[in-house]
């Protein structure tokens, strides 16, 4: 099986000279839901943006087996058009026929529990529905690796749980399971992943059992890792 993501000795420094990552290594061994926690400034969000090719590393190597999509903490920052269908159209391949485009949009919406929402105005959606739509955008674009930067930080507990369950289903479906790398500041979410790691000072620790890592961090951080 091809390794979905490999990051080797990745370093990044901001224009003001402040280092964000220092020889960071990461390997996701198989499809699944993988999570990162760490304090503010530990480099988590910077790492995702480097993997998504939004930033240029100073040194190191990134190898992703397939297309990469990034889901932001606030879906309003990436949902750009008025309706659900029109927004998903942005990420589709240009050579698809009209019928194929309609089918791809409908399929992606159904996968995230928004079947029949094609003409629904985005401004009428709840926060959880908007985040599901952002995830549908990743699916519509045929992404193999989905990066999620604190996707539940702005959601109520019910919506948080719904998005978490959705990602678990997408990463463990029998046919073509996704690979997801999820940043979280909620330690309880670590109980629902295939592996979790702690980022500190621009470097990443080894993968651990998520529940065990949450239990180890809870006394230090009051049950909540800083975003």
Where are the model-predicted features located?
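Helix N-cap at the start of a conserved alpha-helix in ABC-type nucleotide-binding domains
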Residues: 157-159
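Conserved beta-strand-loop-alpha-helix hinge in the C-terminal portion
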Residues: 203-227
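A short, flexible loop at the N-terminus of ABC-type nucleotide-binding domains that lies
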Residues: 1-7, 11-23
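Helix-to-loop junction immediately C-terminal to a conserved catalytic motif
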Residues: 52
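Conserved ABC ATPase signature
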Residues: 121-125, 129
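Catalytic Walker B motif of ABC-type/P-loop ATPase nucleotide-binding domains
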Residues: 146-150
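Conserved ABC ATPase "signature" region
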Residues: 99-117
């Amino acid at each position: 099986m091809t390794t979905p993501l490999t990051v080797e000795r990745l370093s990044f420094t901001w224009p003001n000279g402040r280092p964000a990552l220092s020889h960071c290594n990461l390997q996701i061994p198989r499809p699944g839901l993988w999570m990162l926690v760490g304090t503010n400034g530990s480099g988590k969000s910077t790492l995702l943006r480097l993997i998504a090719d939004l930033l240029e590393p100073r040194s190191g190597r990134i190898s992703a087996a397939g297309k990469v999509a990034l889901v932001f903490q606030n879906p309003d920052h990436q949902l750009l058009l008025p309706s659900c269908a029109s927004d998903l159209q942005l990420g589709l391949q240009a050579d698809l026929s009209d019928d194929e485009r309609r089918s791809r949009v409908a399929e992606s919406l159904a996968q995230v529990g928004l079947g029949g929402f094609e003409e629904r105005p985005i401004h009428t959606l709840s926060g959880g529905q908007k985040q599901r739509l952002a995830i549908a955008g990743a699916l519509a674009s045929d992404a193999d690796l989905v990066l999620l930067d604190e996707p539940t930080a702005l959601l109520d507990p019910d919506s948080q749980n719904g998005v978490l369950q959705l990602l678990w289903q997408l990463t463990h479906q029998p046919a073509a399971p996704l690979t997801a790398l999820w940043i979280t500041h909620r330690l309880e979410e670590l109980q629902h992943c295939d592996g979790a790691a702690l980022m500190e000072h621009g470097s990443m620790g080894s993968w651990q059992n998520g529940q065990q890592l949450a239990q180890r961090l809870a006394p230090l951080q009051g049950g909540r890792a800083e975003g």
